[in-house]
């Protein structure tokens, strides 16, 4: 099992989002994430949480944003009950297959000023069971 964690200042993400163009939004977030951020009541906070989750996932894989991995290789989606899930694509998905690893769980939390996330990555054969 591997754990990744990240924390980010919400104002830092808000500043990047509010520069006047959508360059940052389009470079970092998938179309689904961007729509979710733009529809959210506190879009800056939501964007920071998704940023932290992406960082936590790549840290759990032990690669960070290297070896061709990009922010858009991790997409954060939400279940009907609001639970975040990570969907992999691109180079990170290939690395996961090569290493027989999968994202078992992610968790996102935030305040007005900070967003934090953790990611648990483990073998494809692993199963997460409720406690």
Curated annotation (Swiss-Prot):
Record field: catalytic activity: apo-[ACP] + CoA = holo-[ACP] + adenosine 3',5'-bisphosphate + H(+)
GO cellular component terms listed in the entry, alphabetical order: cytoplasm
Main location: cytoplasm
Enzyme Commission number(s) from the entry: 2.7.8.7
Listed cofactors: Mg(2+)
Cytoplasm among keywords: yes
GO biological process entries: fatty acid biosynthetic process
InterPro entries in the record: 4-PPantetheinyl_Trfase_dom, 4-PPantetheinyl_Trfase_dom_sf, ACPS, Ppantetheine-prot_Trfase_dom
Tagged with keyword Mitochondrion: no
A Pfam family it matches: ACPS
Binding of Mg(2+), residues: 6, 55
Recorded GO MF terms: holo-[acyl-carrier-protein] synthase activity; magnesium ion binding
Keywords for this protein: Cytoplasm, Fatty acid biosynthesis, Fatty acid metabolism, Lipid biosynthesis, Lipid metabolism, Magnesium, Metal-binding, Transferase
Subcellular localization(s) per the UniProt record: Cytoplasm
Family: Belongs to the P-Pant transferase superfamily. AcpS family.
Cited function: Transfers the 4'-phosphopantetheine moiety from coenzyme A to a Ser of acyl-carrier-protein.
Protein name, entry field: Holo-[acyl-carrier-protein] synthase
Gene name tied to this protein: acpS
């Amino acid at each position: 099992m591997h754990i990744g964690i990240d924390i980010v200042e919400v104002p830092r993400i808000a500043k990047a989002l509010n520069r006047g163009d959508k360059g940052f939004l389009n470079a970092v977030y998938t179309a689904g994430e961007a729509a979710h951020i733009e529809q959210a009541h506190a879009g800056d906070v939501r964007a920071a949480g998704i940023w932290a989750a992406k960082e936590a996932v790549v840290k759990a894989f032990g690669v960070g944003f290297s070896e061709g991995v990009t922010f858009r290789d991790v997409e954060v989606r939400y279940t009907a009950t609001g639970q975040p899930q990570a969907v992999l694509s691109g180079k990170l998905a290939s690395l996961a297959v090569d290493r027989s690893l999968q994202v078992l769980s992610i968790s996102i939390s935030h305040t007005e000023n900070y967003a934090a996330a953790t990611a648990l990555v483990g073998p494809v054969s692993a199963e997460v069971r409720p406690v």
